[in-house]
Structure formats: structure tokens, C-alpha cells
């Protein structure tokens, strides 16, 4: 599992040419500031020297062990920093949680957001502390666990979204490209919504239809994106995107 995760992380950075995941304040042409955006795109000026593939494929077992230990240490530090950085105020939870769903990149992302992979790896580390028997019985596949609602996640561009609703309830135009010092990067949004081809399109899974009406519905949260309002003013605003699929219930009357 560790080797698989390390391979995914290496692939993530190799394909995305990602810049460090830190809050950035990038200035493009015209001194337009972009505060609080995680720039995961191909920013050559920010990435520094590139490491060749041969530097990551050592045949020595000691080198592999050292590499694994290094990655685990870095990942654990990222998880700790992410937990410390999360605000405790209820109003800021959505904005903090879904910041990772926006990516600036020169090409289509090939992997889910890195924080999603970190969360999966954290769950793996927690499971590693269990005994083999407990871990085997806690495997969702062995317990036959199924999601109440089937969902699907994918990266979409501003060309797909075109418009969105901001926090004031107004409709704004989502700009496809963001100017940076070395050119332009596209805005990508990692959206999660109910799967129209799933088995729960007629209702939630596991709900007693004799007593309840159920429906799987896509819900939205706010993320920051570069937009233009009806007065042609360009700026960073919080907009709503699809982020989850939840089950809604209403009790049947007259029974």
C-alpha cells in the first residue's frame, strides 16, 4: 500500500508539474493579484530544478527504504499542518475544506486533488495500527458496505461551467484562463455529483420505501475562482460548485 501510494504521489507531481501546495499570492500582467489560491499548475519559475526520473528509481533496497521514509515523513507533516490550518469557525469550514478542489494547470489533471490522496493515506496509516484480523474484518469490501447514494467525481473547466452563482446570489462568468508571469493557466474544478447512471437514481439505497420517500441530490459548496461580474469587473470570488451527493428523506403520509 505504501509503495502504491508513493507511486501515485510521484505520478501526481510528475504529470502535474505541481508547485508546492502553499497559499500563493501570484501577480500576473497588469499587477492583478490572486490571493489565497493554490497554484498546482506548471509554474516553472516556482518549481525550481526538475528531478530526473532516474533519481527516483534506485535499485538499492536501502535507497528505496530511505525514499519511503522521507515521503511518509513529508506526508505526515502535511497532514499535521492541514489539521492546524483548518479554522474552527463554522462559517469558514466549507471554504477551507474545498480549496483543494480548484487547480490552476496548463493541462488536464490526471489525479484527484492531492489532499484527497493524503486523506486516503491517513486512513491507511490508521488501519496499519490494527491487528491483521481486525483490519481484515474492517475492510468495507468484506463487510459488504455500499454507499447510500452513487456519486461521480471529475475535473471540469470554466469552458464547461461558463457561469456560476457567487456568495451574494449573483450570476458571474467563470474565466477559463488565469494570467501568470509566464503566460496563462486554466482553471480546473474537481466536482462531485450524483451519478445519473448509478443504481440510486430512483432513490437512496437501503431506505424502507414503505415509510419513506428518498432522493439522491447533489449539494454544493463554495470555492474561490477568478470570475467576471455583470459590470465586467474581474476578481476572485467564492462561487458554488458541486461537491457531494447526499440522501434526502421525507416521511410518507397517510400510512
UniProtKB/Swiss-Prot annotation:
Range of residues in the leader sequence: 1-18
Propeptide: 19-136
Disulfide-bonded cysteines: 149-216, 194-245, 204-247
Residue ranges, annotated region (Disordered): 44-67
Location relative to the cell: Secreted
GO biological-process terms attached to the record: cell surface receptor protein tyrosine kinase signaling pathway; modulation of chemical synaptic transmission; negative regulation of neuron apoptotic process; nerve development; nerve growth factor signaling pathway; neuron projection morphogenesis
Broad class of where this protein is predominantly found: secreted
Superkingdom of origin organism: Eukaryota
Family membership: Belongs to the NGF-beta family.
Function: Important signaling molecule that activates signaling cascades downstream of NTRK2. During development, promotes the survival and differentiation of selected neuronal populations of the peripheral and central nervous systems. Participates in axonal growth, pathfinding and in the modulation of dendritic growth and morphology. Major regulator of synaptic transmission and plasticity at adult synapses in many regions of the CNS.
Subunit structure: Monomers and homodimers. Binds to NTRK2/TRKB. Can form heterodimers with other neurotrophin family members, such as NTF3 and NTF4 (in vitro), but the physiological relevance of this is not clear. BDNF precursor form: interacts with the heterodimer formed by NGFR and SORCS2. Mature BDNF has much lower affinity for the heterodimer formed by NGFR and SORCS2.
Designated name of the protein: Neurotrophic factor BDNF precursor form
Taxon lineage: Eukaryota, Metazoa, Chordata, Craniata, Vertebrata
